[in-house]
């Protein structure tokens, strides 16, 4: 069994920069993890559900880390996120900016968040650098009574990630934000480790430090 699994869902393929980051992790972390690529489906909700269901049903590792195809990170970033999971944070991620560097890709509970290197509870966490364990998935299935869809087909999955909307806030919720909603419904909190600040490749590479130290929620 490996310590954790890295999963990349990328219909357009993985950037060379992200591939280089993964190779560096292989060199420094050796055989502590496996990488799984899901690249032949443009329906991001479905592919994330398939990948997460595969992880839940497998025995190759206790923790899973989603990384987007255009995120830049170090072995230290991966190791810190893995340690957070080992320390009992069932759903936690690192910080990264949106592609234009305008703000950090998460939504806070308070109006502002200080990027001070501590772990903080947030409302919504994006999947670009997100980790979780099998317990939270099992509890989602049991407590939310999630059905197994497309059983025994190539796309068999539980609907952990679904694009929907919030009636109370009157906003659209992306599949990763809905995952956070489901986690809270199952009795869990959502966290971000502000000591983990990874890059996001757009027209240039942006890091959270390129955004304001304090920023308004989007």
Stretches with model-predicted labels:
Residues 8-9, 25, 41, 70, ...:
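Polar low-complexity intrinsically disordered regions
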Residues 60-72:
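Short beta-strand-to-loop acidic/aromatic patch adjacent to the donor-nucleotide binding site
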Residues 144-218:
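C-terminal catalytic/acceptor-binding lobe
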Residues 52, 74-164:
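Conserved catalytic core of nucleotide-sugar-dependent glycosyltransferases
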Residues 63, 89-91, 190:
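Short, Asp-centered acidic motifs that coordinate Mg2+ and/or phosphate
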Residues 30, 86, 184:
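Anion (oxyanion) recognition and catalysis
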Residues 1-42, 46:
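N-proximal low-complexity "stem/linker" segments adjacent to membrane-targeting elements
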Residues 49-63:
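Active-site nucleotide-sugar/metal-binding loop of Leloir-type enzymes
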